[in-house]
């Protein structure tokens, strides 16, 4: 079984990391971006550009507040909890994520590097005062759109919009160069520079395991490709590792 193979690779790895995309959160009720039912099938990606935010902050927030409310009702699924458990076991050193939903942290993962920010945080573009997103949504309900800081500046979500550089890419690539195994989970692996993370691990001689519903451009260089539902597959990996650990200690 692929589950056993992945478990064995994790057990023999000395520095394994996870790289996650929107596909890990679909079982939590959050749509991915580019899949058959993805967000960009329903909305124009232009709504998530820095140019649109600057041109029409009110229109931008009409879209983003709906997205925020959808994210805030979501809870971690079994895949998030499985990764948190693998981290507690010492088998996953870090999670590098493209996601902005904060579900890895809610599931208990501690070393999470967010490339695209976190929708649960906001800040003023003028004075840089920070806000939690619940406060901003309350402000919208009371004062209308766009939400404004006490200084008069427009508040924006602390996420990377199209047209902006990603966060933490240098530290993420540094981790990737150290890793000897990467689990690429729920990502189309088409977005640059984030897709350099799994590619870097492979180029440095590490193993690449891809868990994704759709084909990716890196499938042909992966050591293992899994098409199963990640919220079912990852708990299976955890159970296998526990059984092996129990067997070895008895």
Curated annotation (Swiss-Prot):
NAD-dependent protein deacetylase which modulates the activities of several enzymes which are inactive in their acetylated form. Deacetylates the N-terminal lysine residue of Alba, the major archaeal chromatin protein and that, in turn, increases Alba's DNA binding affinity, thereby repressing transcription. NAD(+) binds at residues 22, 26, 33-34, 98, 100-101, 116, 187-188, 212, 230. The lineage of its organism: Archaea, Thermoproteota, Thermoprotei, Sulfolobales, Sulfolobaceae. HAMAP family: Sirtuin_ClassU. Binds 1 zinc ion per subunit. Keywords: Cytoplasm, Metal-binding, NAD, Transcription, Transcription regulation, Transferase, Zinc. Belongs to the sirtuin family. Class U subfamily. One of its GO terms (cellular component) is cytoplasm. Zn(2+) binds at residues 124, 127, 149, 151. It is an enzyme of class 2 (transferase). It is found in: Cytoplasm. This is NAD-dependent protein deacetylase. It catalyses: N(6)-acetyl-L-lysyl-[protein] + NAD(+) + H2O = 2''-O-acetyl-ADP-D-ribose + nicotinamide + L-lysyl-[protein]. It comes from the Archaea. Its cofactor is Zn(2+). Gene3D superfamilies: SIR2/SIRT2 'Small Domain (3.30.1600.10), TPP-binding domain (3.40.50.1220). One of its GO terms (molecular function) is histone deacetylase activity, NAD-dependent. Its EC number is 2.3.1.286. The active site is at 116 (proton acceptor). InterPro entries: DHS-like_NAD/FAD-binding_dom, NAD-dep_sirtuin_deacylases, Sirtuin, Sirtuin_cat_small_dom_sf, Sirtuin_class_U, Ssirtuin_cat_dom. Residues 1-244 form the Deacetylase sirtuin-type domain. Nicotinamide binds at residues 33, 100-101.
């Amino acid at each position: 079984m692929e589950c056993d193979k992945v478990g064995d690779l994790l057990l023999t790895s000395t520095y394994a990391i996870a790289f996650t995309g929107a596909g890990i959160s679909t079982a939590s009720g959050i749509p991915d971006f580019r899949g058959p039912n993805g967000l960009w099938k329903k909305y124009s990606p232009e709504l998530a550009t820095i140019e649109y935010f600057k041109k029409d902050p009110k229109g931008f927030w009409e879209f983003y507040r709906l997205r925020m409310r959808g994210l805030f009702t979501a809870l971690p699924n079994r895949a998030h909890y499985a990764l948190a458990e693998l981290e507690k076991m010492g088998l996953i050193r870090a999670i590098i994520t493209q996601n902005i939903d904060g579900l890895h942290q809610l599931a208990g993962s501690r070393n999470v590097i967010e490339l695209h920010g976190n929708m649960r945080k906001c800040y003023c573009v003028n004075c840089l005062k920070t806000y939690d997103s619940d406060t901003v949504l309350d402000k919208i309900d009371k004062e209308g759109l766009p939400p404004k800081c006490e200084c008069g500046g427009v508040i924006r979500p602390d996420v990377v919009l199209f047209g902006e550089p990603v966060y933490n890419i240098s530290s993420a690539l540094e981790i990737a160069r150290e890793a000897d195994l990467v689990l690429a989970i729920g990502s189309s692996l088409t977005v640059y520079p984030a897709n350099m993370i799994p590619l870097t691990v492979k180029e440095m001689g590490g193993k690449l395991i891809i868990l994704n519903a759709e084909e990716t451009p890196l499938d042909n260089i992966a050591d293992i490709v899994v098409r199963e539902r990640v919220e079912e597959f990852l708990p299976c990996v955890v159970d296998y590792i526990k059984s092996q650990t129990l067997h070895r200690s008895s």
